[in-house]
């Protein structure tokens, strides 16, 4: 079954995910002038660099849209972001700094909610601005077809006629000007930025070079903490969770998770918290590089993980982290609503997150520099008296108990020695006098 249309379907309704930028503006106008009936759909994702959402549909109508809709995706975006946080669905990290999968979460929400809106309007052909080299083309493809099985895909950037006529930004700008729209290209940055209220992604152009780094980036959700001229004061912050849901910051309760995340963004952003530089594997297995911002999610995740480690046992934490890495990869691949992802996500939400009730206090300084100051929860299994170095009444175990426990360890120690001796005999191990391995001469002794 062919779902991708190589040429413009003239005379038919075509929905386009419309950002208001030059690419989608030129594409919409071009589709109308070539005989299609374009419908424009704009997702309000709380992008920190978008000053006026209401203006975007108005521009789409000016460029020839049959209809233009602004779809408020903020509540769903935050709900999915918190679900990812609860499950630890983050598989990309470098030296302890995490990428919070903010773009994949945004695509899951956009890809389903915009296609659902199109379906309501009887629009069954969808186009967007993703290129054939990136992840988004596959994410949108999957989410679109999951939402509307009758969906057809038309992408101007896969249409050779469109490419021949409007192959670059200069050509698009001139095309708009000749059509009577004084569309001026914005000043070219040294990199590309994509954002939603969960986080921002900076990539491409100069950032494709590994000798260009974070110092060329102008943060849109925080501050350039690496610049000595930027003044940042240390700040104490408290974060409270109830049954896995963040509910309060600095003692102020938020009934609306969207408002809570916005405040978390403001707090974390004042310090540049949550910025990271990652080399990652795209869905097609080629490596790319991105610099990411996620101040609010980073703040919430620090507090959440602190409570996780204080409440759950070691095996639960290990399973949560293993499943989280698997789920993070599925999310990255555009499989957030696949059965295997739902299974992992709901397991974490039920058996890990529901126990996470408590409050964490931390001090934020510059960038990702912070200290944990206090952790409080009625569900803590951390009990310092169990291991206190001081004499305590009614100690949970005695020296005699520990002797018994150590004696039982002899069983596996003997087995381990025999295995090591077997490896020596087969030549797998040949410890020398300077080796840190035990000097095994007889597996029975």
From Swiss-Prot:
Entry GO CC: cytoplasm
Which SUPFAM superfamilies does the entry mention? Answer: Adenine nucleotide alpha hydrolases-like (SSF52402), Argininosuccinate synthetase, C-terminal domain (SSF69864)
Which PROSITE patterns does the record match to this protein?
ARGININOSUCCIN_SYN_1, ARGININOSUCCIN_SYN_2
Q: Does the keyword Ribosomal protein apply?
A: no
UniProt-listed Gene3D superfamilies:
1.10.287.400, Argininosuccinate synthetase, chain A, domain 2 (3.90.1260.10), HUPs (3.40.50.620)
GO molecular function list: argininosuccinate synthase activity; ATP binding; protein homodimerization activity
Binding positions for L-citrulline per the UniProt entry: 99, 135, 139, 192, 201, 203, 280
Q: What is its pathway?
A: Amino-acid biosynthesis; L-arginine biosynthesis; L-arginine from L-ornithine and carbamoyl phosphate: step 2/3
Key words, A-Z:
Amino-acid biosynthesis, Arginine biosynthesis, ATP-binding, Cytoplasm, Ligase, Nucleotide-binding
Compartments (UniProt record)? Cytoplasm
Q: Which residues form a coiled coil?
A: none
The entry's ATP-binding residues are 17-25, 43, 129, 131, 136, 194
Single GO biological process annotation from the record: argininosuccinate metabolic process
| Positions contributing to L-aspartate binding | 131, 135-136
Q: What is its EC number?
A: 6.3.4.5
Q: How does it assemble?
A: Homotetramer.
Q: Which PANTHER family match?
A: ARGININOSUCCINATE SYNTHASE (PTHR11587:SF2)
The family line of this record is: Belongs to the argininosuccinate synthase family. Type 2 subfamily.
Q: What is this protein called?
A: Argininosuccinate synthase
Please name the source species.
Bordetella parapertussis (strain 12822 / ATCC BAA-587 / NCTC 13253)
């Amino acid at each position: 079954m062919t779902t991708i249309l190589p040429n413009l379907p003239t005379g038919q309704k075509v929905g386009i995910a419309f950002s208001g930028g030059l690419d989608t503006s030129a594409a919409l106008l071009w589709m109308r002038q070539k005989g299609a009936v374009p419908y424009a759909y704009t997702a309000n994702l709380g992008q920190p660099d978008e000053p006026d959402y209401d203006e975007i549909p108005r521009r789409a109508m000016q460029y020839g849209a049959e209809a233009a809709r602004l779809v408020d995706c903020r509540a769903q975006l935050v709900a999915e972001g918190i679900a990812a946080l609860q499950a630890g669905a983050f598989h990309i990290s470098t030296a302890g700094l995490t990428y919070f999968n903010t773009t994949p979460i945004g695509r899951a929400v956009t890809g389903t909610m915009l296609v659902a809106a199109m379906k309501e309007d009887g629009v069954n052909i969808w186009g967007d601005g993703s290129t054939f080299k990136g992840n988004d083309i596959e994410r949108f493809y999957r989410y679109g077809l999951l939402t509307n099985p009758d969906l057809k895909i038309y992408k101007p950037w896969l249409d050779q006629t469109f490419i021949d006529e409007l192959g670059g930004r200069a050509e698009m700008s001139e095309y708009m000007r000749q059509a009577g729209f004084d569309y001026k290209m914005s000043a070219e940055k040294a990199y590309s930025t994509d954002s939603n209220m969960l986080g921002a992604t900076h990539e491409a152009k100069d950032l494709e070079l590994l000798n260009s780094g974070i110092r060329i980036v102008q943060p849109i959700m925080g501050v350039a903490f690496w610049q000595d001229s930027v003044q940042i004061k240390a700040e104490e912050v408290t974060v409270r969770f109830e049954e896995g849901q963040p509910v309060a910051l600095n003692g102020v309760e938020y009934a609306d998770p969207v408002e809570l995340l916005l405040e978390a963004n403001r707090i974390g952003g004042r310090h540049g918290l949550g910025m990271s530089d990652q080399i990652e594997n795209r869905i097609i297995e080629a490596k790319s590089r991105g610099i990411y911002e996620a101040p609010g999610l980073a703040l919430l995740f620090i507090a959440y993980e602190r409570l996780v480690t204080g409440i759950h046992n070691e095996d639960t934490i290990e399973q949560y982290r293993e499943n989280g890495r698997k789920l993070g990869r599925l999310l990255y691949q555009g499989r957030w609503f696949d059965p295997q992802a739902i299974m992992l996500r709901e397991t974490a939400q039920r058996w890990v997150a529901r126990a996470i009730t408590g409050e964490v206090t931390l001090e934020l300084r510059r960038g990702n520099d912070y200290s944990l100051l206090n952790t409080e929860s009625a569900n803590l299994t951390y009990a310092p008296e169990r291991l206190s170095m001081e004499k305590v009444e009614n100690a949970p175990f005695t020296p005699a108990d520990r002797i018994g426990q150590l004696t039982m360890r002899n069983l596996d120690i003997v087995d381990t020695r025999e295995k090591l001796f077997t490896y020596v005999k087969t030549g797998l191990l040949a410890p020398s006098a300077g080796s840190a391995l035990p000097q095994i001469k007889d597996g029975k002794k």
